[in-house]
From Swiss-Prot:
Pfam (any one): KH_2
Keywords: Cell inner membrane, Cell membrane, Cytoplasm, GTP-binding, Membrane, Nucleotide-binding, Ribosome biogenesis, RNA-binding, rRNA-binding
Name of the protein in question: GTPase Era
Family label: Belongs to the TRAFAC class TrmE-Era-EngA-EngB-Septin-like GTPase superfamily. Era GTPase family.
Domain KH type-2: 200-276
GO cellular component: cytosol; plasma membrane
Region (G2): 36-40
Residues covered by region (G1): 10-17
Species annotation: Borreliella afzelii (strain PKo) (Borrelia afzelii)
Cross-referenced PROSITE patterns: G_ERA, KH_TYPE_2
Length: 290
């Protein structure tokens, strides 16, 4: 029986959360085409007759001096220190740049075993040759590279085999039926946040957060009251929408997803509240990121 922890690293929107959800077979980490949707270290657990893999999905690696971004980068660095294996995902539609150079430098300096995953091989018009040459110049051996499609589950079985090859004998850290260790409040707040940013302006993901005010498991299903906090008045108007159209849509879509995931009816009530410049408050950022 083998077991261990594997950190999923990469630029924003490379497919890290998609890979986590795909392998674990459940919606664990929220997904959005908008970069840096993931803020926290999200654990996904895969168990089979060979053992157990605990995946840690991390925020997208992005070089920036903004306070919120620095906090997320600290999350990435702490994740590296907690694992036996690093899974570095590269989107083969993107040209390698400064982030790739820095990420490979961090990985090599960590002395931790790693695999490079070239994601989205199901798509056309990729930069696969350019990326392969880039990795060769960086001294990455072919045996450390796997071409995958997280969305289409191409070569994900090969990936799991490779992960187990890099793990040592060990116990199951979680019961077999577990697929995440996230608390229900966090999972529900993330679902609401996902629905809030799906059809809204790109700057909003970095300007809103969700707090669960009430969560009760009643005979008729889940009863939830939640607040969506924004940093300024104009953002509040965007989320509420004309005649409350947007917030109603967010609530309906979040309700359906929550009901499906937790296999129960869901009564969800949302409010949008203003908390000026919350994304500059160190204590709040630390709570949200950790």
């Amino acid at each position: 029986m083998k077991s261990g922890f594997a950190a999923i690293l990469g630029r924003p929107s490379t497919g890290k959360s998609t890979l986590l959800n795909s392998i674990c077979g459940h919606k664990i980490s929220i997904i959005s085409p908008i970069p840096q949707t993931t803020r926290n270290k999200i654990k996904g657990i895969f168990t089979d007759d060979r053992g157990q893999i605990i995946f840690i999905d991390t925020p997208g690696f992005h070089l920036s001096k903004k306070k919120f971004n620095i906090a997320m980068m600290n999350n990435i660095h702490s994740s590296i220190g907690e694992v036996e294996l690093i899974l570095y995902i590269i989107d083969i539609q993107d040209t390698p740049g400064e982030e790739e150079n820095k990420m490979l430098e961090i990985i090599k300096n960590s002395k931790i075993k790693f695999l490079v995953l070239l994601n989205k091989v199901d798509l056309k018009n990729t930069k696969i040759k350019e990326i392969t040459q880039f990795l060769k110049e960086k001294g990455i051996e072919d045996s450390n590279i796997i071409k995958i499609s997280a969305e289409k589950k191409i070569n994900t079985e090969e990936l799991k085999n490779k992960i187990y090859e890099n793990f040592s004998e060990g116990p199951l850290y979680y019961p077999q039926e577990y697929y995440t260790d996230q608390k229900i409040n966090f999972r529900i707040s993330e679902i609401i946040r996902e629905k809030a940013i799906e059809n809204l302006k790109e700057e909003l993901p970095y300007s809103l957060y969700v707090d669960i005010d009430t969560l009760e498991n009643k005979k008729r299903g889940l009863f939830i009251r939640a607040n969506i906090f924004v940093a300024n008045e104009s953002q509040k108007g965007i989320i509420v929408g004309k005649n409350g159209k947007e917030i109603k849509s967010i609530g309906e879509r979040a309700r359906k997803t929550i009901a499906k995931i937790f296999e129960t009816k869901c009564n969800l009530f949302l409010q949008v509240k203003l908390k000026k410049n919350w994304n500059k408050e160190d204590k709040l950022i630390k709570r949200l990121i950790n």
